[in-house]
Regions:
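Divalent metal-dependent phosphate-bond-processing catalytic cores, especially two-metal-ion Mg2+/Mn2+ enzymes
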Residues: 1-10, 14-24, 37, 87-169
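Short amphipathic alpha-helical interaction patches enriched in hydrophobic/aromatic residues
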Residues: 20, 39-44, 59, 63, ...
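Membrane-helix interface segments
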Residues: 26-28, 68
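Conserved strand-to-helix beginnings and helix N-cap segments that scaffold or border functional pockets
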Residues: 45-49, 109-110
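His-Asp-centered metal-binding catalytic motifs of divalent-metal-dependent phosphohydrolases/nucleases
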Residues: 28-46, 73-82
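An active-site-proximal "capping" alpha-helix that borders the catalytic cofactor pocket
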Residues: 12, 49-62
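Hydrophobic, well-structured mid-protein blocks that either form specific transmembrane helices
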Residues: 59-99
């Protein structure tokens, strides 16, 4: 398990719906569908192009209109942190809500557990032992091999400052 299981999807969807209500979002349908499917085209987990085609076919099969499908796919494709690159992509309120909900599930106790689960899934160590004289500063940690602890510095410790909605903040 990578930490992207059905329990994660359920938490993200529940959080997104709560945020949507508090933010008075009008398109709850987009928030709910994008939340439920938010990891289906994540390049960490699948081949993105093939997954996007399957996702689009599925969304048409449940009789969504083209504009709604395009919005859902845009949100899902630009949701992931991706080394901070997706933070430059402007999302609709619906997209901001789903992104915030996903990020909220990556911090706190659940986020800590998921970070170690993710590292284990990808055969990354908890931490790579270093001589005391070589322990990096937070700015230098990205030069070290991937590990669960490095993931905190690469991403998790930055998320609280990247929330879009007032409710998530």
């Amino acid at each position: 398990y990578s930490g992207h299981d059905i329990a994660h999807v359920e938490r993200v969807t529940s959080l997104a719906l709560k945020i949507a209500k508090a933010e008075q979002c009008q398109r709850i349908d987009i928030v709910e569908i994008a939340s439920l499917l938010h990891d289906t085209v994540d390049s960490k987990l699948t081949t993105s192009d093939a997954a996007t085609i399957k996702l689009e076919k599925f969304l048409y099969s449940i009789n969504l209109d083209t504009l709604t499908i395009n919005e859902i796919i845009f949100i899902i494709k630009h949701l992931s942190y991706r080394n901070g690159e997706n933070n430059q992509i402007s999302l609709s309120l619906e997209g901001q809500i789903v992104r915030d909900a996903d990020r909220l599930d990556a911090i706190g106790a659940i986020g800590i557990a998921r970070a170690f689960q993710f590292a284990g899934h990808f055969n990354e160590p908890m931490w790579t032992e270093l001589p005391t004289s070589s322990i990096p500063s937070a700015d230098e940690i990205t030069t070290f091999e991937p590990s669960a602890i490095r993931h905190f510095y690469d991403k998790l410790l930055k998320l609280k400052d990247l929330m879009h909605t007032e409710t998530a903040r």
